[in-house]
Amino acid sequence: MSSGGLLLLLGLLTLWAELTPVSSKDHPEFCELPADSGPCRGILHAFYYHPVHRTCLEFIYGGCYGNANNFKTIDECKRTCAA
C-alpha cells in the first residue's frame, strides 16, 4: 500500500475513533439516554451526559419524570458518566 493510502487509512481510523461514542462498559447505560425535560412545567437547571460530545451539558428539567440521565450538578454528571 502506498504512503498516501496508509495516510488516508490512518485518517479514517482516527475519525472513526473520535465519532464512536464511549461504550456502555465505561459508564451506566442510562448515560446514553437523551436529555428529557419530562411533562411538568418547572424550570430547574439540570445536567445530562451527551455521549457524542462526551461531556455533560446543561438543560431545563420540568421537575418530574424524565429519565436517569439527569443530574443536579455538573460534577455529579461527570463522576457518573464522563469518568
Swiss-Prot record:
Pfam families xref list: Kunitz_BPTI (PF00014)
Disulfide bonds: 31-81, 40-64, 56-77
Record's keyword annotation contains Cytoplasm: no
Coiled-coil intervals: none
Signal peptide boundaries: 1-24
Alphabetical keyword list: Disulfide bond, Protease inhibitor, Secreted, Serine protease inhibitor, Signal
Localization annotation: Secreted
GO terms for MF: serine-type endopeptidase inhibitor activity
Tissue: Expressed by the venom gland.
Site positions for Reactive bond for trypsin: 41-42
Domain of life: Eukaryota
Record's GO cellular component terms: extracellular space
Domain BPTI/Kunitz inhibitor residues, every copy: 31-81
Family annotation (SMART domains): KU
Family statement: Belongs to the venom Kunitz-type family.
Entry function: Serine protease inhibitor.
Record-given protein name: Kunitz-type serine protease inhibitor tigerin-1
Organism: Notechis scutatus scutatus (Mainland tiger snake)
